[in-house]
A protein has these predicted regions:
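Bacterial N-terminal signal peptides
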Residues: 9-19
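Accessory carbohydrate-binding/adhesion or oligomerization-edge regions at the termini
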Residues: 21-67, 77-79, 143-174, 195
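Aromatic-lined ligand-binding clefts that engage carbohydrates, nucleic acids, or primary amines
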Residues: 52, 80-104, 144-146
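Extracellular and analogous surface-interaction loops
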Residues: 74-86, 132-138
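Beta-strand-rich ligand-recognition modules
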Residues: 103-143, 147-160
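First transmembrane helix
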Residues: 174-204, 297-318
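Signal-transducing coiled-coil linker helix
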Residues: 384, 388-391, 395, 399-402, ...
Length: 406
């Protein structure tokens, strides 16, 4: 009974952590979901005479302007009954890829490096929060300008909130915890499992399952870096190309793991997987710098095709064996497929743009469960081997004693 109570308490804490929180203050927080938009390369907010067009928020560029890339400006007007006396803040739960904010013509801040394509901060997975002093606001009409830069197919901005800093900061910190810090922890867990599996493989090279799972986790770690690394170590969009290519590597290595786990040998299919991994970086590099969204669509297609293939093999294997291990691997695959579909839906516009990406969590949970299963199998085999050695030594001693008696 105590264990059940502890489990329910733990689940309650998890649900409370992931549940959205809302402002409860006396001063209302404004939800700004109406804007005007114009593509413009200027470094300062365009004048009112620019070719502004009405735009509702959230705005997913892959839906509203799928081929657009470069700089765009949002002009968001709002009204305050009076000039505030306390600190205010501007909070954007999600922007892509990076943005700078101007309030009534004054620069508020940006998410980091903003000189594309050479250097650009990756903020597609980071909420934006900027404090505004009362002097920047006025009674009556106010204007917030947001300058966005994005590659084709991945730009966008969620509805923006403005209100007292004390009211908006908890919303920002809650989102930052889930969207950045927890995903950084997930990346660390994936890296740990990758190192552990590759270490076991070096100790027993004949157990290629460990090597393939380690390779899958290592590639998944590189892919998850796209979500958690803001300042890319490579110039331009080459960092994005590397991280997106890693998704294909991760799934291909996982398919090889599934074949070894189920005892299947399909040499022609395995050869295709190795050919795909050899050619994928070159294909992505050729088109990735201009068609970012196309790369996401291509890698997602490979992801779904290989996962469905693996699900078919695992379903047959589980139906024949009915083991806990086979059910666990199959369940992890289904879980990853669902969360991967959710994240692809964000790009496709079928899932709300402001939704968080769940792929890092899927990769972490899958790595932990399957990695733990293989470690348990490795330890069990080691224990059986040691037990067999003890039994053999006992038999040798017994036979030696019998020979001495004779």
């Amino acid at each position: 009974m105590t264990k059940l109570r502890d489990l329910l308490s733990f689940l309650a804490v998890i649900c409370a952590t992931f549940a959205p929180i809302t402002s409860l203050g006396d001063v209302p927080v404004l939800q700004l979901d109406r804007a005007e938009f114009v593509m413009d390369d200027g470094e300062l907010p365009p004048p009112d005479s620019a070719a502004w067009k009405p735009q509702s928020l959230p705005d997913n560029w892959n839906v509203s302007r799928p081929q657009a890339s470069g700089f765009g400006w949002y002009q968001i007007r709002f009204v305050l009954a009076q000039q505030p006396m306390q600190l205010y803040a501007v909070y954007a739960p999600k922007i892509s890829i990076s943005a700078a904010f101007y309030l009534n013509g004054q620069y508020l801040g940006s998410g980091g490096a903003f000189t594309p394509p050479a250097t650009i901060a990756r903020n597609a997975n980071r909420p934006q929060f900027f404090v505004a002093t009362p002097q920047l606001l006025r009674s009556g009409g106010n204007t917030l300008h947001v300058r966005i830069w994005s590659a084709a197919g991945v730009g966008g901005i969620a509805a923006v909130q403005i209100g007292p800093e004390a009211e908006l900061r908890p919303l920002y910190e809650h989102r930052y915890l889930l969207q950045v810090q927890f995903q950084q922890i997930s990346a660390a867990l994936i890296g740990f499992v990758a190192v552990l599996m590759l270490f076991l493989w070096t100790r027993r090279p004949q157990d290629t399952m460990h090597g393939y799972l380690g390779g899958s986790c290592l590639a998944a770690l590189v892919h998850v870096a796209l979500f958690v690394v803001r300042d890319a170590p490579l110039p331009g969009l080459w960092w994005d190309v590397l991280c997106l290519t890693a998704l294909g590597f991760s799934v291909a290595f996982y398919a090889l793991f599934v074949l070894r786990f189920t005892g299947r040998r399909r040499r022609s299919f395995e050869a295709l997987l190795w050919l795909y991994m050899a050619m994928n970086p070159f294909v992505v590099a050729l088109v990735g710098l201009k068609q970012y969204g196309l790369i996401i669509a291509f890698e997602s297609l490979v992801f779904f095709v290989l996962f469905v293939f693996c699900m078919g093999i695992l379903a047959q294997f589980w139906w024949r064996r009915r083991t806990v291990e086979s059910f666990l691997v199959f369940s992890v695959l289904v879980f990853d497929l669902i969360l991967g579909g959710h994240d692809f839906g964000i790009f496709a516009g079928t899932v709300p743009f402001e939704s968080m990406f769940w792929t890092p969590y899927a990769s972490a949970l899958g790595s932990i469960f399957i990695g733990g299963m293989l470690v348990n199998r490795f330890v069990s085999n080691l224990n059986d081997y040691e037990k067999l050695n003890v039994e053999l030594e006992g038999r040798v001693v017994q036979k030696h004693a019998e020979l001495e008696e004779n």
